[in-house]
């Protein structure tokens, strides 16, 4: 019978225990990360996550032996130099922290361009010399201008996904253009019964928060108009019911402590409206004076009324901003 070294068993057992004791388990790729930068990235995680490097087969065995059946699917995402990350952070926050910790790196011959590599037009600060020919050789339009070498136009020299030739890598390094990114690549994360891949976790935060805020506002509007009571709509529905009840009481001339002043004001306004239809000879001097006073005050009343909708709009904006601020917490 083949003997398995104790240290191997211990490594697998450690990964199993960490998998069973953490809510969020991720698979990352640490390939091509210098030791110094890896140490810096570990510090960026702080006490929020545990990063464990191990062999692929050790990780596979640990996932298979785990008490959580759903984590077995993570074995499909083992690439490069794999490692496991254990945390309580939600997957989106973990992804953001790892992405933010990435740093620029110079291109190496044979590396795959992560995006189109463009050399911008402008002064290179290099004096006339052999580098002019090197630039032109890799497709960068350059000339000598006022004692230095100048790139005359923006030049795309490598397309996204293409291999970077040695000559291009060398010239990019001389120009101090670092098109590569060095960092911990989060490949997949398991939370509960769901496995999130990197393409799902890579979202536009502002756009997502705005979309959720709009959906929240639409849901509130629907619940209010449909009369659906919940913790969010109840205060608005009560306010609406109070306004409707007040309007009904005023229009029906039902006297209460809330409506008496308004009904009297309405009756007074109606009296003045009727008086306007009569000739000045049919009404007394006191009423004529009131009609004249009302006519003089009319423009002011119109100006006051135009301010009310602005207040309502401000209240709606405040509600939307509060909703967006709360949703922002989802992404740390």
Curated annotation (Swiss-Prot):
Keywords, A to Z, come to: Ribonucleoprotein, Ribosomal protein, RNA-binding, rRNA-binding
As for family, the record states: Belongs to the universal ribosomal protein uL10 family.
SUPFAM superfamilies registered for this protein in UniProt: Ribosomal protein L10-like (SSF160369)
> Which NCBIfam families does the annotation name?
PRK04019.1-5 (NF003098)
The keyword Protein transport appears for this protein = no
Q: Name one GO molecular function term.
A: structural constituent of ribosome
Entry protein name: Large ribosomal subunit protein uL10
Please describe the quaternary structure of this protein. Part of the 50S ribosomal subunit. Forms part of the ribosomal stalk which helps the ribosome interact with GTP-bound translation factors. Forms a heptameric L10(L12)2(L12)2(L12)2 complex, where L10 forms an elongated spine to which the L12 dimers bind in a sequential fashion.
Q: Acidic residues bias located where?
A: 304-320
Function comment: Forms part of the ribosomal stalk, playing a central role in the interaction of the ribosome with GTP-bound translation factors.
For the biological process aspect of GO, one term held by this record is:
cytoplasmic translation
Region of interest called Disordered, as start-end residue ranges on this chain? 294-332
Q: Which organism is it from?
A: Methanosphaera stadtmanae (strain ATCC 43021 / DSM 3091 / JCM 11832 / MCB-3)
Enumerate the CDD domains for this protein: Ribosomal_P0_L10e (cd05795)
Q: Which gene encodes it?
A: rpl10
Q: One cellular component GO annotation, for this chain's record?
A: cytosolic large ribosomal subunit
